[in-house]
Regions:
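Ferredoxin-reductase
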Residues: 2-88
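FNR/FR-type flavoprotein reductase catalytic core
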Residues: 76-196
Length: 196
Protein backbone atom coordinates (compact mmCIF):
# COMPACT_ATOMS: atom_id res chain seq x y z
CA UNK A 1 0.00 0.00 0.00
CA UNK A 2 1.28 3.40 -0.96
CA UNK A 3 0.97 6.43 1.22
CA UNK A 4 -0.09 9.82 -0.06
CA UNK A 5 2.47 11.24 -2.46
CA UNK A 6 4.30 7.94 -2.96
CA UNK A 7 4.61 6.39 -6.39
CA UNK A 8 5.88 3.20 -7.92
CA UNK A 9 8.37 3.19 -10.77
CA UNK A 10 8.53 0.19 -13.07
CA UNK A 11 12.11 -0.99 -13.50
CA UNK A 12 13.48 -2.25 -16.80
CA UNK A 13 15.21 -5.52 -15.95
CA UNK A 14 16.37 -6.39 -19.46
CA UNK A 15 16.63 -4.60 -22.80
CA UNK A 16 17.07 -6.69 -25.93
CA UNK A 17 17.50 -5.28 -29.42
CA UNK A 18 15.61 -7.60 -31.78
CA UNK A 19 16.38 -5.42 -34.80
CA UNK A 20 17.75 -1.90 -35.22
CA UNK A 21 14.31 -0.39 -34.51
CA UNK A 22 12.54 -3.25 -32.67
CA UNK A 23 13.17 -3.66 -28.94
CA UNK A 24 12.06 -6.00 -26.19
CA UNK A 25 11.93 -4.86 -22.57
CA UNK A 26 11.40 -7.07 -19.54
CA UNK A 27 9.72 -4.95 -16.87
CA UNK A 28 9.32 -5.53 -13.17
CA UNK A 29 5.53 -5.41 -12.74
CA UNK A 30 4.37 -8.12 -10.30
CA UNK A 31 0.74 -6.97 -10.01
CA UNK A 32 0.29 -6.84 -13.78
CA UNK A 33 2.12 -10.16 -14.30
CA UNK A 34 -0.11 -11.85 -11.74
CA UNK A 35 -3.29 -10.90 -13.63
CA UNK A 36 -2.07 -10.84 -17.26
CA UNK A 37 -3.69 -13.09 -19.86
CA UNK A 38 -2.94 -13.61 -23.57
CA UNK A 39 -4.44 -10.87 -25.71
CA UNK A 40 -4.17 -8.11 -23.12
CA UNK A 41 -2.11 -4.93 -23.17
CA UNK A 42 -0.64 -2.21 -20.96
CA UNK A 43 -0.51 1.56 -21.29
CA UNK A 44 2.77 3.14 -20.30
CA UNK A 45 4.14 6.63 -19.88
CA UNK A 46 7.91 6.99 -19.79
CA UNK A 47 8.00 10.25 -17.82
CA UNK A 48 5.69 13.03 -16.67
CA UNK A 49 5.96 14.76 -20.07
CA UNK A 50 5.38 11.65 -22.16
CA UNK A 51 2.21 10.55 -23.88
CA UNK A 52 0.45 7.33 -22.97
CA UNK A 53 1.49 4.46 -25.23
CA UNK A 54 -0.54 1.21 -25.48
CA UNK A 55 1.59 -1.92 -25.99
CA UNK A 56 0.67 -5.59 -26.08
CA UNK A 57 1.93 -7.81 -23.28
CA UNK A 58 4.20 -10.04 -25.37
CA UNK A 59 5.06 -12.32 -22.45
CA UNK A 60 4.60 -12.54 -18.70
CA UNK A 61 6.03 -14.56 -15.85
CA UNK A 62 3.84 -14.72 -12.76
CA UNK A 63 6.57 -16.26 -10.57
CA UNK A 64 9.20 -13.65 -11.44
CA UNK A 65 6.65 -10.82 -11.49
CA UNK A 66 7.70 -9.63 -14.94
CA UNK A 67 6.10 -8.70 -18.24
CA UNK A 68 7.69 -8.27 -21.65
CA UNK A 69 6.77 -5.61 -24.18
CA UNK A 70 8.02 -5.48 -27.75
CA UNK A 71 7.82 -2.24 -29.70
CA UNK A 72 8.99 -0.60 -32.89
CA UNK A 73 10.64 2.81 -32.70
CA UNK A 74 8.39 4.94 -34.92
CA UNK A 75 7.77 8.25 -33.16
CA UNK A 76 8.77 10.57 -30.34
CA UNK A 77 7.39 8.44 -27.48
CA UNK A 78 8.90 5.16 -28.64
CA UNK A 79 12.20 6.96 -29.35
CA UNK A 80 12.32 8.14 -25.73
CA UNK A 81 11.33 4.65 -24.55
CA UNK A 82 14.10 3.10 -26.69
CA UNK A 83 16.69 5.42 -25.10
CA UNK A 84 16.14 3.74 -21.71
CA UNK A 85 18.33 0.87 -20.54
CA UNK A 86 18.24 -1.96 -18.02
CA UNK A 87 18.12 -0.40 -14.57
CA UNK A 88 16.10 2.61 -15.73
CA UNK A 89 12.44 2.98 -14.79
CA UNK A 90 9.16 3.86 -16.46
CA UNK A 91 6.92 6.31 -14.62
CA UNK A 92 3.47 4.83 -15.31
CA UNK A 93 2.36 1.35 -16.32
CA UNK A 94 -1.35 0.51 -16.26
CA UNK A 95 -2.76 -2.92 -16.97
CA UNK A 96 -3.54 -5.53 -17.83
CA UNK A 97 -6.19 -3.95 -20.04
CA UNK A 98 -8.44 -5.32 -22.75
CA UNK A 99 -10.36 -8.53 -23.12
CA UNK A 100 -8.33 -11.69 -22.81
CA UNK A 101 -8.35 -14.11 -25.74
CA UNK A 102 -10.82 -16.97 -25.44
CA UNK A 103 -8.63 -20.06 -25.10
CA UNK A 104 -10.04 -23.52 -24.38
CA UNK A 105 -8.60 -27.04 -24.62
CA UNK A 106 -11.30 -28.18 -27.06
CA UNK A 107 -10.39 -25.84 -29.92
CA UNK A 108 -8.47 -28.46 -31.91
CA UNK A 109 -6.10 -27.11 -34.55
CA UNK A 110 -5.46 -23.39 -34.29
CA UNK A 111 -3.50 -21.30 -36.81
CA UNK A 112 -1.75 -18.22 -35.39
CA UNK A 113 -0.54 -15.76 -38.02
CA UNK A 114 1.77 -12.84 -37.28
CA UNK A 115 3.51 -10.45 -39.59
CA UNK A 116 6.28 -8.07 -38.63
CA UNK A 117 5.90 -6.76 -35.09
CA UNK A 118 2.50 -8.53 -35.10
CA UNK A 119 4.30 -11.73 -34.10
CA UNK A 120 4.61 -10.32 -30.55
CA UNK A 121 0.85 -10.34 -29.74
CA UNK A 122 0.32 -13.87 -31.07
CA UNK A 123 3.15 -15.39 -29.01
CA UNK A 124 1.27 -15.56 -25.66
CA UNK A 125 -1.88 -16.70 -27.48
CA UNK A 126 -0.07 -19.54 -29.28
CA UNK A 127 1.75 -20.56 -26.08
CA UNK A 128 -1.47 -20.80 -24.05
CA UNK A 129 -3.27 -22.61 -26.90
CA UNK A 130 -0.51 -25.23 -26.83
CA UNK A 131 -0.40 -25.42 -23.00
CA UNK A 132 -4.10 -26.33 -22.84
CA UNK A 133 -3.67 -29.09 -25.43
CA UNK A 134 -4.54 -27.61 -28.82
CA UNK A 135 -2.56 -28.27 -32.02
CA UNK A 136 -0.84 -24.99 -32.97
CA UNK A 137 0.31 -24.03 -36.47
CA UNK A 138 2.15 -20.71 -36.62
CA UNK A 139 2.63 -18.71 -39.80
CA UNK A 140 5.02 -15.82 -39.36
CA UNK A 141 6.54 -13.40 -41.79
CA UNK A 142 8.61 -10.29 -42.17
CA UNK A 143 10.05 -8.14 -44.93
CA UNK A 144 13.35 -9.98 -44.51
CA UNK A 145 14.86 -12.61 -42.21
CA UNK A 146 16.75 -10.02 -40.18
CA UNK A 147 13.54 -8.53 -38.79
CA UNK A 148 11.77 -11.81 -38.13
CA UNK A 149 11.16 -11.73 -34.38
CA UNK A 150 10.51 -14.52 -31.85
CA UNK A 151 11.17 -17.33 -34.35
CA UNK A 152 12.98 -19.57 -31.82
CA UNK A 153 10.31 -18.93 -29.20
CA UNK A 154 7.48 -19.75 -31.63
CA UNK A 155 9.20 -22.98 -32.68
CA UNK A 156 9.26 -24.13 -29.03
CA UNK A 157 5.52 -23.66 -28.53
CA UNK A 158 4.11 -24.59 -31.95
CA UNK A 159 3.54 -27.96 -33.55
CA UNK A 160 4.43 -26.46 -36.92
CA UNK A 161 6.00 -23.13 -37.92
CA UNK A 162 5.79 -21.72 -41.44
CA UNK A 163 8.08 -18.75 -42.14
CA UNK A 164 7.38 -16.53 -45.12
CA UNK A 165 8.98 -13.44 -46.56
CA UNK A 166 6.76 -10.45 -47.21
CA UNK A 167 7.88 -8.36 -50.15
CA UNK A 168 4.50 -6.77 -50.81
CA UNK A 169 1.47 -5.70 -48.83
CA UNK A 170 0.52 -7.75 -45.77
CA UNK A 171 -2.44 -9.75 -47.19
CA UNK A 172 -0.31 -11.05 -50.07
CA UNK A 173 2.34 -12.55 -47.80
CA UNK A 174 -0.10 -14.89 -46.08
CA UNK A 175 -2.47 -15.54 -48.96
CA UNK A 176 -0.68 -18.63 -50.25
CA UNK A 177 -0.22 -20.09 -46.78
CA UNK A 178 -3.83 -19.55 -45.74
CA UNK A 179 -5.30 -20.75 -49.01
CA UNK A 180 -3.45 -24.05 -48.64
CA UNK A 181 -4.88 -24.42 -45.11
CA UNK A 182 -8.41 -23.02 -45.52
CA UNK A 183 -9.85 -26.24 -46.90
CA UNK A 184 -8.43 -28.25 -44.02
CA UNK A 185 -11.46 -29.37 -41.99
CA UNK A 186 -9.36 -29.97 -38.88
CA UNK A 187 -8.57 -26.26 -38.48
CA UNK A 188 -11.06 -24.63 -36.18
CA UNK A 189 -9.63 -21.15 -35.62
CA UNK A 190 -7.34 -18.52 -37.17
CA UNK A 191 -5.69 -15.65 -35.21
CA UNK A 192 -4.17 -12.97 -37.43
CA UNK A 193 -2.13 -9.95 -36.29
CA UNK A 194 -0.18 -8.01 -38.91
CA UNK A 195 2.00 -4.92 -38.41
CA UNK A 196 4.52 -3.87 -41.03
Amino acid sequence: NLGKGESVMFKILNKKVLHENILQFTLEAPLIARKAEPGQFVVLRVNEYGERVPLTIADFDREKGTIDIIFMVIGASTTVLASLNAGDSILDLVGPLGKKTDIRPDMGTVVCIGGGIGVAPIYPIARKMKQVGNHVITIMGAKNKDILILKDEMEKISDEVIVTKCERKAPKFIYGDISSLKNNDSISLFFIVLYF
